[in-house]
């Protein structure tokens, strides 16, 4: 119903809310008794039957049913529909007794609602009725008469679903046998209801005119009338004859009413259609009644014969036929010649007005029922009738529809045959039919290309066959004579029109081919039985006639049977005979016609070279290939013997005119033909070959023609015709298999391949020659080659040679060469080969194809389109190979040789990424095809054959560069004590992939493809392949600064899904892990790292790992493999297992000799294991670690020379280096985990710190050896130890100090820390001076991270006491002392260094210096006095010079990006370093700015304004800051009131932490923006106000959303927590309202000011409001408020600083200093100076800056007050 106040869909009325009303009525039984009155007036008793009283109703009907029945009386469609559906459900669900209670009220409801306007309601009503019937069954009987009339109407509903539902309900109520009885039982009531609807009802009586629109009333009335007419027809069909008699009076009464007959002229087509259907039924079932009303029936039906409505037409014509049959004197009541026939002829002339398919099948029965009296003169009548039919065929509507055209043609021939049958002896009629109708009709169809010829030819052939059959079967000589005369006349006239068509010089091809088609159909007529059945099925007046009226049926159709029966009887024997047999009556005239047409055609060909006549001749000969016809085609001159030919051919030509014609005429035509569509000439050739007596003769002729006479194009067409027709193939099979054709094709292949390789341009007909080869190689039927097998092999060999030579040609040459044609030929050969065995040359060809597909374009020089062709050709060949029944790996040459070639490619050849990708793709395609092989072992054997042996794998692994070790060594995951590699990987940086990578990826690709077949490989081949791929992937992953082609290699594997996750599903993890453990225990190194990666990626627990090594003792004595295995397992072992491993090592630390200390099974190896366990914090026994420290200390005493203190490392052995590295690692880990709370003795601290400093000195003294990996590792570990010591002492707390030795802290600060940084700072400068362009990931710069991290702990004093060489720039303007300027000039350039650790270390060191620098400018501040017009002072020159260089770099990186579009900078890229350095430089400048005094800040800000550096920064920041600067982990926490953002959290500039690198630049950009807004608010405000609108909005929106609240809170907090005291002024702050209140008091004067921060602070203006004002004049008050507002808006500082400036200004005012009369302020708002420049005339003083502005803006040099010249 919709909402109570919603817009209604119709009527715009509010809903009736019928559901609620019905419920109320159901409840209030006392108020409304029963059903009386609801929905009607009190005079209408509603639904109450007369037999019951109102007081009994409530007890009989269920309350739910009452509510539903009330709903059904409502007008709303939706209410009724839902109520009816609910009623149906209740009928199904409720018990029978409850449903039976509804029956007394159902008839009236049903009768009303079954006529409802809405079709959905009507459908639902019938569906609900069916459910009611199924429930109550026979109890419906008492109420049947009340509903049957409407029920019958419902079955004729114009809405098919409603009608179907009513029929379903009727069938549910009565079985088919009982339905007539049920109808008969209610016939009187039905007739009464239907007659009332037809005669009494009007639109206004059926519907309420006041509530129902006129259109709806009319529609309902028309539907009711239609249903009533159809229901009457249904009643007539249902009732048996004996029941119909009792209704005759009823029908007479109906037919006597003029209103009934008016329905025949009704404006609604459905009503007329139903009317005519009822008339047909009345004629059929009550013919006597209709005869009595003949005067009304005949005009009503016959005068409507031109009704062209498609709805009415079928019913009308059925009524016409029934009227003619039932009412014999119907023509007495109409004027046929003036009224009926003119309308009929008009319809026919117009082609049935689009209804020919419906109307024309009735024409034959119609004319068969016409009495002779009304057709006189019959010659004119039938002539007019047939002429009208032919005219109708020419209408555009008929020609555009094949069904319409076919119907007209069919009707024409049916009527023609009938008229001929009825008037066979009448010469004049016969001549009219043949000469004036049939022949002109044929001529019309032949002339008009828009008509469909097929139906006409079929009907003509069928007509001739029927006449011939009748002539053969007829016993009356007169009848036979008449029929023969008809046929003779027909053939004579047909010959004339056909010859006339052919004789036209400009006859078009369609016209002449139409003639040949007609002759062909007459030669081989199609089955006429099908047409006959089709015709009889369309005579509808004989259908569905009950048994009682068989006599009527016979009388109605007897004439039709007589007219057509003889046809059918004569045709049946013809239809059973072969279609190729022609009647003798037809054979002679047809042959004469063919010969005559051939003669005419050949004359046109000879004289005018007419191509259309040649095509006609071809089609003619195809149907009539006889010697007589060929004899006609030869002129007298051409009947002599063929000369210059072999004797056999000459003899054959003498005997056979067809062969003679072939040589004299056809060969010349074939060779002269320039058109591609010359196939009709080849058809003539086949027609001539059919005339040869044997296959030998045909072979001789074709062999002779092949040698010299036939062109390649003609030869191609001959073979194509043979392949397209089995009959033609049978004619030429001996020739196709013969040697003449085979040798010629082999020679053709030689010619084509050699010619195209030598000269890339091909002749115009070469594509035809290639097509000929392709056709010859393709197989035909029964797996047999089209030509001889030996010739196929020879051609394949030649094609193979051609493909092999492609590598020697350029890409351009290959594009135009024969390779493309070869691919087409070979592809066709493979595709058509079926299941036949491949010959050896084919397998060699397959191998070459595979090699071309598996190599990159750089090697093959083939364009892309050729590669695609080659691939398709290869796959078709391999597909053929694997489906051979007897194909195995050993038998296949291709499979064996392809394996060898693949192994050679990946193990011996130099492959780059592109080559490998192509190879993998080709191998995958090949394996994908092999998967489909029926031989299950083939795939496994193939992969096993490609698999290298163990020794080959080992050789490839050893060939891999070992630079991968660098990262595991630095990270402490592996330990080595021998020299492993010498140089950076860059020296070996080529594009060639190592063979191991190629081999492992190839085999991985193979097993991925093979998984479709669930392959089981023997001897752990699958696990070995996966292990080798993991080895390759781990090698790539461990490489630092790997060449770009290796990342490309990994990308290729990802793209091809060659990943461990995809391969792991193919093998059990346990077997793979066991294999890896075995290899790790044996070899260590990369295999150990693979185990760690596998355990991590597969989330394998320590309990699952344990079975693989069983006993821990098995790892000892230590080898390199067992050491590396334990180191890799440590992160995944349980704490207890690590303790057990540690326990195995403890005894080994005691009693070592000097040599044993450095060996793997000595101190070095065991200490390495201990370090690995300690690194995972699994050893918490502090005493144990303290004991090991003491042992190491004892080594220092016993074997001092193994400690590399202050020595030359070039003399140290790798074993000693390795031991020192492990000792340093232990000391670092000891400091991190155990130094506190474990108290150490002074000697132990001395040992640690002195050793650290000595190792650092060694590192510093051996810079030349940093390229040696172990030396570099030694340096890194020594820096780590120094860094850990610095971190330890930096984070020390008072609690820890109490447990440390007394002088330890002072010793650290005074000696050790100073010693560390005095060594590292020069070392850093020297290291980066030699390698300016190396990134932090390179080998040489690996030590930068620990070195730089250590330098971040350097103190300011240590920096200032540096010993760096002087570095000064002559042009630099500076107030700094030389040693400080040197430090700046040395450290500042490091902000642009390529390595991030250096940039961050330089920032940290410079950041400690920045607060010291402004003081040096402060001391020289007087030199920047008031004399300058706009004084400006540069921040440190070194920083500004660097900033200038950085701005140029940033312009290149970000300049082209619009402001507001976020740029993502790739971590550690070159651009990353540029942006990082730029942002760090600005952080330093802002730190410097914040440390300066107010006066200095004014000078610095003026400098920044002049250089516009700040503007550039702000533009760049809005390209770098993220749209949502929220931390990732807090972005999800929506409930958090204050989520963490990049503005609330300080950026951590960590050197070692790399996990946050993607957020490094965005966070840093936000930090710089925050500092800029905080420290330079006035300058940012100025930039914002001057920016364009788009940028203005972006900045305002972003700042208001993310920054303003943070800054406002910080500003208010700084006021609240400020310790600054003002004499005479108090300051308070309110955080909630963002207000600051300042109260200034001096003597009796009180001034209170309220400062309000804007929502977009600091971009918006700060408002100053007045509070208390005591003792101050209004004007002065306003001036002071304006001054404060100006200070807060234009000064770059905090609110407290602005208030301090304002207070000083007021104080000076009270001290007697006058305001400057230009700015009306005592203290200048920008440079904080007092008014000093006095006018000599008026003695007023002004600020120097204000005067300068006055002079420049006014262009005068006068005093602003007295206007006298200012001196």
From Swiss-Prot:
Keyword Ribosomal protein attached: no
Reported modifications of this chain: Autoubiquitinated.
InterPro entries in the cross-refs: ARM-like, ARM-type_fold, LTN1/Rkr1, LTN1_E3_ligase_6th, LTN1_HEAT_5th, Ltn1_N, LTN1_UBC, RING-CH-C4HC3_LTN1
Any single GO BP term: rescue of stalled ribosome
The protein's annotated pathway: Protein modification; protein ubiquitination
Segments annotated as HEAT repeats: 59-96, 100-138, 273-314, 335-372, 380-418, 433-473, 509-547, 621-658, 676-714, 1067-1104, 1183-1226, 1315-1353, 1378-1415, 1476-1513
One of the record's GO cellular component terms: cytosolic ribosome
Family matches, as CDD domains: RING-CH-C4HC3_LTN1
Superkingdom of origin: Eukaryota
Tissue spec. comment: Widely expressed, including in the brain and spinal cord.
A molecular-function term among this protein's GO annotations: ubiquitin protein ligase activity
EC number, as in UniProt: 2.3.2.27
Compositionally biased region (Polar residues): 572-581
Zinc finger RING-type: from-to: 1716-1763
Enzyme type, top EC level: transferase
Effect of gene knockout: Embryonic lethality. Mice with a milder mutant caused by an internal in-frame deletion of exon 11, producing a 14-amino acid deletion prior to the RING-type zinc finger, display profound early-onset and progressive neurological and motor dysfunction.
Region (Disordered): 550-583
Remarks, miscellaneous: Was named listerin because of the 'tilting' or 'listing' phenotype observed in mutant mice.
Function: E3 ubiquitin-protein ligase. component of the ribosome quality control complex (RQC), a ribosome-associated complex that mediates ubiquitination and extraction of incompletely synthesized nascent chains for proteasomal degradation. Within the RQC complex, LTN1 is recruited to stalled 60S ribosomal subunits by NEMF and mediates ubiquitination of stalled nascent chains. Ubiquitination leads to VCP/p97 recruitment for extraction and degradation of the incomplete translation product.
Family: Belongs to the LTN1 family.
Name of the protein: E3 ubiquitin-protein ligase listerin
Species of the source: Mus musculus (Mouse)
């Amino acid at each position: 119903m919709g909402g109570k106040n919603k817009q209604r869909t119709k009527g715009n009325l509010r809903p009736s809310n019928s559901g609620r009303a019905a419920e109320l009525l159901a409840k209030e039984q006392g108020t409304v008794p029963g059903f009386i009155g609801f929905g009607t007036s009190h005079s209408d008793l509603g639904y109450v039957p007369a037999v019951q009283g109102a007081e009994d109703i409530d007890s009989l009907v269920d309350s739910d049913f009452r509510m539903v029945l009330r709903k059904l009386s409502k007008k709303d469609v939706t209410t009724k529909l839902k109520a009816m559906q609910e009623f149906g459900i209740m009928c199904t669900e409720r018990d029978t007794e409850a449903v039976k209670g509804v029956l007394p009220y159902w008839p009236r409801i049903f009768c009303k609602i079954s006529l409802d306007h809405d079709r959905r309601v009507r459908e639902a009503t019938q569906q609900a009725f069916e459910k009611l019937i199924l429930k109550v069954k026979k109890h419906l009987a008492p109420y049947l008469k009340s509903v049957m009339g409407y029920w019958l109407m419902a079955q004729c509903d114009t809405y098919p679903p409603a009608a179907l539902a009513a029929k379903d309900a009727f069938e549910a109520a009565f079985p088919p046998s009982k339905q007539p009885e049920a109808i008969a039982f209610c016939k009187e009531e039905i007739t009464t209801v239907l007659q009332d609807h037809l005669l009494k009802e009007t639109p206004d009586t059926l519907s309420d005119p006041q509530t129902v629109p006129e259109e709806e009333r009319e529609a309902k009335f028309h539907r009711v009338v239609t249903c009533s007419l159809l229901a009457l027809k249904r009643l007539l069909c249902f009732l048996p004859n004996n029941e119909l008699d009792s209704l005759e009076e009823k029908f007479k009464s109906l037919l006597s009413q003029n209103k009934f007959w008016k329905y025949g002229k009704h404006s609604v087509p459905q009503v007329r259609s139903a009317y005519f259907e009822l008339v047909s039924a009345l004629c059929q079932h009550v013919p006597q009644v209709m005869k009595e009303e003949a005067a009304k029936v005949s005009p009503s039906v016959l005068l409507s014969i031109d009704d062209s409505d498609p709805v009415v037409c079928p019913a009308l014509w059925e009524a016409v036929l029934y009227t003619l049959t039932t009412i014999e004197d119907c023509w007495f009541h109409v004027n046929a010649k003036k009224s009926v026939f003119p309308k009929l002829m008009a319809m026919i002339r117009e082609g049935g007005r689009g209804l020919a398919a419906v109307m024309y099948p009735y024409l034959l029965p119609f004319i068969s029922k016409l009495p002779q009296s009304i057709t006189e003169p019959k010659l004119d009548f039938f002539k007019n009738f047939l002429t009208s039919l032919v005219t109708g065929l020419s209408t555009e509507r008929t020609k555009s529809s094949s069904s319409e055209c076919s119907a007209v043609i069919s009707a024409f021939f049916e009527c023609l045959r009938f008229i001929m049958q009825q008037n066979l002896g009448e010469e004049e009629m016969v001549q009219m039919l043949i000469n004036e109708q049939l022949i002109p009709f044929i001529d019309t169809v032949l002339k008009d290309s828009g008509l469909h010829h097929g139906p006409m030819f079929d009907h003509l052939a069928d007509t001739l066959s029927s006449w011939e059959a009748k002539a053969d079967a007829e016993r009356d000589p007169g009848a036979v004579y008449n029929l023969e005369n008809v046929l003779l006349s027909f053939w004579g006239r047909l010959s004339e029109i056909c010859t006339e068509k052919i004789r036209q010089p400009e006859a078009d091809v369609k016209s002449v081919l139409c003639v040949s088609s007609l002759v062909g159909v007459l030669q081989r007529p199609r089955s006429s039985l099908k047409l006959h059945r089709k015709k009889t099925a369309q005579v509808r007046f004989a259908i569905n006639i009950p048994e009682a009226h068989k006599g009527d049926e016979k009388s109605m159709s007897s004439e039709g049977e007589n007219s057509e029966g003889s046809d059918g009887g004569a045709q049946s024997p013809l239809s059973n005979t072969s279609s190729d047999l022609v009647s003798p009556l037809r054979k002679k005239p047809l042959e004469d016609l063919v010969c005559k047409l051939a003669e005419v055609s050949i004359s046109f060909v000879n004289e005018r070279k007419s191509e259309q006549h040649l095509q006609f001749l071809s089609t003619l000969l195809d149907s009539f290939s006889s010697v007589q016809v060929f004899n006609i085609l030869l002129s007298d001159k051409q009947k002599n013997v063929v000369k210059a030919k072999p004797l056999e051919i000459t003899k054959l030509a003498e005997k056979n005119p067809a062969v003679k014609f072939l040589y004299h005429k056809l060969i010349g035509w074939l060779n002269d033909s320039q058109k591609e569509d010359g196939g009709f000439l080849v058809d003539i050739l086949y027609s001539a070959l059919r005339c040869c007596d044997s296959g030998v003769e045909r072979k001789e002729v074709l062999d002779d023609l092949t040698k010299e006479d036939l062109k390649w194009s003609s030869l191609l067409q001959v073979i194509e015709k043979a392949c397209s027709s089995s009959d033609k193939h049978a004619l030429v099979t001996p020739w196709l298999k013969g040697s003449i054709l085979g040798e010629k094709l082999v020679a053709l292949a030689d010619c084509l391949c050699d010619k195209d390789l030598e000269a890339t341009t091909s002749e115009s007909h070469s594509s035809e020659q290639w097509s000929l080869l392709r056709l010859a190689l393709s197989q035909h039927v029964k797996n047999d080659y089209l030509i001889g097998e030996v010739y196929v092999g020879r051609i394949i060999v030649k094609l193979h040679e051609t493909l092999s030579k492609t590598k020697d040609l350029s890409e351009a040459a290959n594009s135009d060469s024969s390779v493309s044609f070869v691919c087409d030929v070979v592809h066709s050969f493979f595709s058509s080969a079926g299941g036949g065995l491949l010959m050896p040359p084919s397998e060699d060809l397959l191998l070459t194809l595979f090699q071309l597909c598996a190599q990159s374009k750089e090697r093959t020089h083939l364009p892309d389109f050729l590669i695609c062709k080659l691939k398709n050709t290869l796959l078709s060949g391999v597909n053929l190979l694997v489906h051979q029944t007897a194909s195995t790996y050993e038998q296949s040459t291709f499979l064996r040789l392809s394996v060898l070639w693949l192994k050679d490619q990946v193990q011996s050849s130099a492959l780059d990424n592109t080559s490998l990708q192509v190879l993998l793709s080709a191998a995958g395609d090949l394996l994908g095809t092999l998967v489909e092989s029926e031989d299950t072992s083939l795939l496994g054997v193939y992969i096993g054959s490609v698999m290298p042996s163990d020794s080959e794998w080992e050789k490839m692994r050893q060939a891999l560069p070992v630079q991968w070790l660098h990262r595991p060594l630095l990270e402490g995951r592996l330990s080595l004590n021998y020299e492993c590699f010498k140089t950076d990987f860059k020296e070996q940086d080529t594009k060639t992939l190592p063979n191991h990578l190629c081999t492992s990826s190839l085999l991985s690709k193979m097993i991925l493809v093979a998984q479709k077949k669930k392959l089981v490989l023997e001897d752990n081949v699958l696990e070995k392949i996966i292990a080798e791929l993991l080895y390759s992937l781990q090698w790539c992953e461990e490489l630092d600064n790997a060449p770009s082609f290796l990342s490309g290699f990994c990308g290729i594997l990802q793209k091809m899904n060659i990943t461990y996750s995809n391969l792991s599903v193919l093998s059990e993890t346990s077997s793979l892990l066991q294999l890896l453990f075995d290899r790790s225990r044996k070899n260590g190194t990369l295999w150990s790292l693979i185990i760690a990666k596998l355990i991590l990626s597969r989330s394998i627990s320590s309990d699952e790992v344990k079975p693989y090594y069983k006993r821990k003792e098995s790892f000892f004595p230590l080898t390199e493999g067992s050491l590396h295995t334990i180191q890799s397992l440590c992160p995944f072992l349980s704490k207890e297992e690590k303790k057990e491993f540690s326990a195995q090592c403890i005894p080994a630390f005691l009693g070592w000799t000097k040599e044993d200390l450095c060996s793997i099974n000595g101190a070095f190896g065991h200490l390495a294991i201990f370090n690995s366990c300690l690194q995972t914090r699994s050893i918490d026994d502090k005493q144990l670690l303290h004991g090991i420290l003491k042992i190491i200390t004892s080594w220092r005493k016993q074997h001092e020379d193994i400690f590399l203190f202050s020595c030359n490392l070039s003399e140290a052995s790798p074993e000693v280096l390795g031991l020192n590295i492990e000792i340093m690692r232990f000391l670092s880990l000891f400091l991190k985990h155990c130094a506190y709370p474990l108290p150490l003795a002074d000697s132990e601290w001395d040992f640690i710190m002195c050793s650290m400093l000595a190792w650092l000195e060694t590192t510093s003294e051996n810079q030349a050896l940093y390229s040696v990996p172990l030396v570099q590792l030694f340096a890194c570990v020594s820096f780590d130890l120094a860094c850990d010591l610095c971190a330890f002492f930096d984070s020390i707390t008072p609690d820890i100090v109490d447990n440390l030795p007394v002088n330890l802290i002072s010793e650290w600060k005074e000696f050790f820390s100073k010693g560390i940084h005095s060594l590292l700072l020069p070392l850093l400068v020297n290291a980066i001076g030699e390698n300016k362009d190396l990134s932090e990931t390179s080998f040489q710069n690996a030590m930068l991270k620990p070195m730089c991290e250590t330098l971040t702990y350097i103190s300011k004093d240590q920096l200032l006491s540096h010993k760096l060489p002087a570095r000064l720039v002559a042009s630099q303007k500076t107030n700094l002392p030389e040693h400080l300027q040197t430090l700046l000039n040395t450290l500042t350039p490091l902000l642009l260094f390529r390595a991030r650790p250096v940039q961050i270390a330089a920032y940290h060191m410079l950041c400690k210096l920045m607060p010291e620098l402004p003081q040096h400018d402060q001391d020289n501040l007087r030199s920047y006095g008031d004399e300058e017009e706009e004084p400006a002072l540069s921040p440190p020159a070194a920083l500004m010079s660097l900033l200038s260089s950085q701005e140029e770099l940033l312009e290149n990186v970000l300049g082209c990006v619009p402001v507001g579009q976020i740029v993502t900078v790739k971590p550690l890229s070159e651009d990353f370093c540029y942006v990082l350095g730029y942002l760090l430089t600005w952080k330093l400048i802002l730190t410097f700015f914040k440390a300066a005094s107010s006066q200095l800040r004014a000078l610095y800000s003026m400098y920044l304004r002049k250089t516009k550096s700040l503007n550039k920064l702000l533009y760049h920041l809005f390209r770098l800051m993220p749209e949502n600067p929220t931390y990732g982990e807090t972005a999800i926490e929506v409930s958090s009131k204050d989520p963490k953002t990049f503005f609330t959290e300080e950026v951590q500039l960590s050197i070692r932490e790399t996990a946050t690198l993607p957020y490094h630049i965005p966070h840093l950009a936000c930090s710089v923006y925050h500092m800029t807004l905080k420290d330079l608010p006035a300058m940012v405000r100025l930039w914002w106000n001057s920016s364009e609108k788009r940028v203005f909005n972006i900045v305002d929106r972003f700042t208001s959303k993310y920054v303003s609240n943070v800054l406002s809170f910080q500003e208010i907090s700084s006021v609240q927590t400020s310790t600054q005291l003002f004499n005479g002024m108090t300051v308070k702050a309110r955080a909630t309202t963002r207000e600051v209140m300042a109260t200034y008091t001096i003597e009796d004067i009180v001034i209170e000011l309220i400062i309000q921060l804007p929502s977009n602070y600091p971009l918006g203006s700060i408002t100053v409001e007045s509070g208390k004002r005591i003792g101050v004049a209004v004007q002065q008050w306003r001036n002071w408020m304006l001054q404060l507002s100006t200070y807060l808006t234009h000064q770059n500082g905090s609110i407290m600083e602005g208030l301090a400036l304002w207070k000083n200004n007021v104080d000076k005012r009270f001290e007697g200093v006058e305001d400057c009369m230009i700015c009306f302020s005592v203290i200048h708002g920008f440079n904080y100076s007092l008014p000093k420049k006095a006018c000599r005339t008026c003695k007023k003083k002004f600020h120097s800056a204000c005067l300068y502005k006055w002079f420049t803006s006014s262009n005068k040099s006068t005093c602003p007050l007295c206007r006298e010249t200012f001196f």
